[in-house]
Amino acid sequence: MRVARLPLLHPHRAAPVVRRQLRGSSLLEMLLVIALIALAGVLAAAALTGGIDGMRLRSAGKAIAAQLRYTRTQAIATGTPQRFLIDPQQRRWEAPGGHHGDLPAALEVRFTGARQVQSRQDQGAIQFFADGASTGGRIDLTIKDARWRVDVGWITGEVRSGPLRTPAP
């Protein structure tokens, strides 16, 4: 048997009393809190990692390292030497298969490597051989006080990439 609930009546009024329950928060309030937490997290991450410039530096360093690894893989797969070229002044790089790219203008680029494989004085080149070995080289990327280094071993052709920590004075 079901019992019907009657609205509560105030003793001096004939109209029902409306109870307001303030037990929770609205969906809009929850979304606002989540958005504020996300914004604070993004700002904290940007401040701790060097912000946009740091992201550009890491992105450029990782892109160059990936293209160097690709060039090495192509040399091994095709059995013919392959060359990776970088132009520090123009901030451009080229890899086999038509791969090429530009580096952000804010970056300072420095190349150290064997002159024998450089076709031009102002251009750096790293050549990879069919056995995976290379002529070796180093690419340093700098923006403000942050540095990223990409090293290529001349015996193994191994590509290593990462931030370069400068000792505190």
UniProtKB/Swiss-Prot annotation:
Gene Ontology annotations for the cellular component aspect, listed alphabetically: plasma membrane; type II protein secretion system complex
Gene name for this UniProt entry: xpsH
Protein name, entry field: Type II secretion system protein H
Classification via SUPFAM superfamilies: Pili subunits
Keyword Zinc-finger: no
One GO BP: protein secretion by the type II secretion system
The family this protein is said to belong to: Belongs to the GSP H family.
Keywords: Cell inner membrane, Cell membrane, Membrane, Methylation, Protein transport, Transmembrane, Transmembrane helix, Transport
Annotated TM spans: 32-52
Species in which this protein is naturally found: Xanthomonas campestris pv. campestris (strain ATCC 33913 / DSM 3586 / NCPPB 528 / LMG 568 / P 25)
